[in-house]
Amino acid sequence: FIFFILGTLFSCKKTDSHPDINEKLLRILDDKIKHKKYYEIKKKNHIQKLKKEALLYKNNDSISYHLNNLIVEEYLGYQCDSAYIYSDKNKEIANRNNNEIWLYKNLLQRSVLLSTTGLFVESKEILDHINPEALPSPLRFSYNSAYECLYSNLSDYSGGDSPYNKIYKNKLADYYNSAYKALKPGDPFYYLFLSHKNRVENNWSQAEQNVNKFLKTTHPGTRLHAIGSFCKAVIDGKLGNIESQERCLIYSAISDIESSTKENRSMQDLASILYQKGETDRAYKYIQSSLEDANFYNARFRNIQISKVQPIIEETYLQTINTQNKQLRWS
C-alpha cells in the first residue's frame, strides 16, 4: 500500500485550486484507513522499546523519570488509560526525590491528559493549585498551554450555542496571549499560539500567515503536522477557502493515522464536509473510523461530539444502500 507520496502533494500549503488534488488525497486517505493496523503496530513497537529501556534503568530515578515522560507523551494522543499508569509512576518518582520541577512537569502533563479525556473539573483543579510565579521559566509555557488545552476542549464540548462558550473563548484569548509571550520568536510553538491569538481577535489573514510558519517546521506523518494542518483548515474555512480547508483536513487525517493519534478531530470534520457534499459512502467510512479511534482512546467528550453527527450520516448511508438494493432487485 501507499507509504510515500510526492512531497508537493503532501503539504498543507497554498497550491493551485483544483478538485482533482483533493480527490487524489482522499484516495490516499482511503488506503491509509485500510492499513491503520500497520501504523498501530509501529506505535506499539516504539512504545515497547521505551518500556524495555525504562526497565534497564529502573534504579536510576532521573533516567526513569525521563523515559516515563516520553512514554506518557507517546500515549497522550494514543491510549489515555496507559498514559495515566506512567504518569502515576512519575508522580511517585518526583515525590520520592522531593523534586519540585519534576512534580510540576508531571502535574501539567496530567492536567492536559485529564482535559483531553473530558475530565475538565479534575484538570482545572490541578492547574488552580499551581502558583505560576513559583514555576521555573521553562514551565511557564507548559502552564499556559495546559490552561489553553482545558478551555479549548471546554469550548468544543459546550458548542457555539452554549452561554458558557463566550466565557471559555475569553479565557482562551488570555492563555493564548500568555503562552506565546512565554516563548521567543523563532520557536515553532510561538507561531502556533500567535496564530491562535490572531484567530480569537478575528485577524484570520494574520492567523494564516503564522500557522503557515508553524507548519514549515513540522513533518508529514507526525502529530504536530496533524495539529498544524487542522488549525489551518479552521482558518481556511473562515476565509472561505473551502477546497483548501478540505485538503488540510485530509493532510491532518493522514498524519493522525500515520502517527497513530487516536485523539483526533480532522476525520470527524472531514466526514461532515463530505456528507454535506453528498459523498455519503466516504462520509460514513470516515465517521466510523473517527468513532473507532475515540472508543480506542476512551475520549468521553469526543464520543459525545461524534454521536451528534454519526447517526445522521449512518441513516443516510443505510437509506442509500437500501435504495441501491431495491434498484438491483427490480433491474
For the regions a protein language model found, what residue spans apply to each?
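Selective detector of the "anchor" transmembrane alpha-helix that sits immediately C-terminal
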Residues: W330-S331
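A "functional boundary" signal
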Residues: F1-K326
